[in-house]
Amino acid sequence: MADEKPKEGVKTENNDHINLKVAGQDGSVVQFKIKRHTPLSKLMKAYCERQGLTMRQIRFRFDGQPINETDTPAQLEMEDEDTIDVFQQQTGGHRI
């Protein structure tokens, strides 16, 4: 029984953080560890820096829904190992 209590303590500690995958359109996957109540803007900016992109060039989606910079993993009910999809911002239109 004494062995069970430390395991529960470890679980509670890890519960504050969540591992998220960010999948690019090119098939690349970058993993991040973030606190459940930290705004996702931190992850989004880190991803952009790592990929040499700006926030204006790409869009982040989770379960098909756009992610706002102020959203947190807890608000979006994200679970450990969930994947965020990244899409290049569509630019252009038609030629006149």
Swiss-Prot record:
Short name of one Pfam family: Rad60-SLD
PTM per Swiss-Prot/TrEMBL: Polymeric chains can be formed through Lys-11 cross-linking. Cleavage of precursor form by a sentrin-specific protease is necessary for function.
GO cellular component, one term: nucleus
Gene Ontology terms describing biological process: chordate embryonic development; definitive hemopoiesis; protein sumoylation
Primary localization: nucleus
Keyword Ubl conjugation: yes
Cross-link annotation Glycyl lysine isopeptide (Gly-Lys) (interchain with K-? in acceptor proteins), location: G93
Key words of the record: Isopeptide bond, Nucleus, Ubl conjugation, Ubl conjugation pathway
Record SUPFAM superfamilies: Ubiquitin-like
One term of GO molecular function: protein tag activity
Propeptide residues per the UniProt entry: 94-96
Position(s), cross-link Glycyl lysine isopeptide (Lys-Gly) (interchain with G-Cter in SUMO): K11
Domain of life the protein comes from: Eukaryota
Domain Ubiquitin-like: 16-96
Cellular localization per UniProt: Nucleus
Role summary: Ubiquitin-like protein that can be covalently attached to proteins as a monomer or as a lysine-linked polymer. Covalent attachment via an isopeptide bond to its substrates requires prior activation by the E1 complex sae1-sae2 and linkage to the E2 enzyme ube2i, and can be promoted by an E3 ligase such as pias1-4. This post-translational modification on lysine residues of proteins plays a crucial role in a number of cellular processes such as nuclear transport, DNA replication and repair, mitosis and signal transduction.
Family: Belongs to the ubiquitin family. SUMO subfamily.
Name recorded for this polypeptide: Small ubiquitin-related modifier 2
Source species of the chain: Danio rerio
